Amino acid sequence: MSVGKAKGAQKTVQKGIHNKVARKVRTSTTFRRPKTLELARKPKYARKSVPHASRLDEYKIIVNPINSESAMKKIEDDNTLVFHVHLKANKFTIKNAVKKLYSVDAVKINTLIRPNGTKKAFVKLSADADALDVANRIGFL
């Protein structure tokens, strides 16, 4: 009997003890749920039959050009066009709209919201584009 016990002990020594798992030390008192697998959604049908058209296209972004005396001075001296723009338009959308509608590159755009609640944009054109020619082409000179 003792020989059988000795053989069993020898086997366990050779295999090693694998049944003790070291516990992870928790350093925080808050339990953070582990990240689990999130499968991509596969809807059975579309929730909207037709996607909504763009709310701000180029024609909505630029409302109209401003041709006041100060705007004319900007055109002549600073190579800058002045526009009324949609209140929710930002500088990036204004730049893209000017490029698409008038096919000129804008270098810089300054915007301000006027006291009457409309937004005004000062579009500085690149050196190769002449603001006077663009204004003539648009038709507000």
UniProtKB/Swiss-Prot annotation:
PANTHER family the UniProt entry points to: 60S RIBOSOMAL PROTEIN L23A
Species name: Schizosaccharomyces pombe (strain 972 / ATCC 24843)
MF terms (GO), sorted A to Z: rRNA binding; structural constituent of ribosome
Gene that specifies this protein: rpl2502
Protein name: Large ribosomal subunit protein uL23B
Annotated family: Belongs to the universal ribosomal protein uL23 family.
Cellular component terms (Gene Ontology): cytoplasm; cytosolic large ribosomal subunit
Keywords for the protein's UniProt record, in alphabetical order: Cytoplasm, Ribonucleoprotein, Ribosomal protein, RNA-binding, rRNA-binding
Keyword Cell membrane among record annotations: no
Subunit structure: Component of the large ribosomal subunit (LSU). Mature yeast ribosomes consist of a small (40S) and a large (60S) subunit. The 40S small subunit contains 1 molecule of ribosomal RNA (18S rRNA) and at least 33 different proteins. The large 60S subunit contains 3 rRNA molecules (25S, 5.8S and 5S rRNA) and at least 46 different proteins. uL23 is associated with the polypeptide exit tunnel.
Keyword rRNA-binding annotated: yes
